[in-house]
Amino acid sequence: MSDSEKEYGTLHIERRDNIATIHMYNLTDGIVAGRKLDFHWEIAMALGELRDDQDIRVVVMTGAKDGEFMVSPRTPHYEDPGALAGHNEPKGSWKIFNGIIRAHTTLTEMEKPVIARVNGDAAGFGQSLMFGCDMIIAREDARIADIHMGMGDVAPYGPPFALVPGDGGASLIPLYMSPALAKEYLMLAKEYTAREMADMHIINYAVPMDELDAKVDGIVAKLLEKPPLTLAWTKRSVNRYIADQHNRTLDAAAAYEMVNFLQWERAGYKQDMDFE
């Protein structure tokens, strides 16, 4: 590891040739729990590190374990004494939401392609990160949902109260769907499979799990054949549209969600919900 490379507790970075792969850990794994670590902050720092690494030309984001790209914890982690941001704890909440804003800003501005290798379910911040990537290649049976309004009922992830989708979903989803479909997806926490999203032309590819690596590797190889400066300028040109969208909506949505976290009772908190 060079002096410029950092160690993270919620993810690890694998470097091979000119490719960096970010492996994201399950948020409820023991390697994360109780250590006052936060994935939202660390993924922002990791993306910034890779943006500055001139040896890296393509970044791939994936889950550390097959079956899960990145999902919100099912258990009430925000009530755990080891949580970074508990109820009525604005300092920890601000670090989380600042990380969210930095992560999306870096994904948008990074002068190199970022590929989502969706090797399992993507829910909550995981699906927002997925939509923030430049191309999305998923196993066809992966479940994808924005669980903020799910209240624990729609998908088996997320908190037992309603939240504004302030982690990037409210900004990015309207770029992928019509306003009517985007509001149905967000307001009802509607779940799709990757196959359904590919058929709707929302993501690039949905393939069987045993074909995922070949598809990702093929796309990465083609990108590496292109001149890096031309790739960078093409991405920056297209992403002015995405940057404008974030500038209009991301800070406000993040602020609304942070307010939700500070007043659960007003957000329909189901205190008797069984998390087992």
Where are these regions (language model features)?
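Conserved CoA-thioester-binding segment of acyl-CoA-metabolizing enzymes
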Residues: 1-62
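Intrinsically disordered, low-complexity segments enriched in small/flexible residues
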Residues: 3-4, 8, 25, 37, ...
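Terminal peptide-recognition signature
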Residues: 22, 43, 61, 113, ...
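Glycine- (often His-adjacent) and acidic-residue-rich active-site loop
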Residues: 29, 35, 55, 63-102, ...
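Catalytic-core regions built around general acid/base machinery
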Residues: 46, 99-111
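CoA-thioester-processing core
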Residues: 103, 107, 117, 123-185, ...
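Acidic, divalent-metal-coordinating active-site segment for phosphoryl/phosphodiester hydrolysis
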Residues: 124, 189-196
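C-terminal long alpha-helix characteristic of the crotonase
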Residues: 137-142, 151, 203-250
